[in-house]
């Protein structure tokens, strides 16, 4: 499950009756993940865990066993400074990289959400394009992150790769 994997990575997790609290405990550790149908690790969270592991201590592997071509977004994380190699349906992640803000394109809904997380974690400014994918699954995502204290806003702009 996601919470078990987060705990394995040295991320604090407290589960209540109707809420889960996630908190920083110290250095986040790398981990190996294989997506699986329920109750295994969810394929829909694979892009987000890859993004987290790119910034974790140590090397990690994430194998996508549910869908093909689910790692297309990795090239966008690389543009931000992530050190990730893709072999088939496996991402080999060389962690502890500080991501840098840049312009990236969202190839799909889940990857778009992961790129928002990467952009919020990066130093400098990031610009995400093709956010229509994000809008299909996350209503006013920028408002939710702003409510948590993030510096995020929506603007009209055309793709200008950096």
What spans do the regions from the language model cover?
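Short, structured segments at the rim of ligand-binding sites
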Residues: 1-162
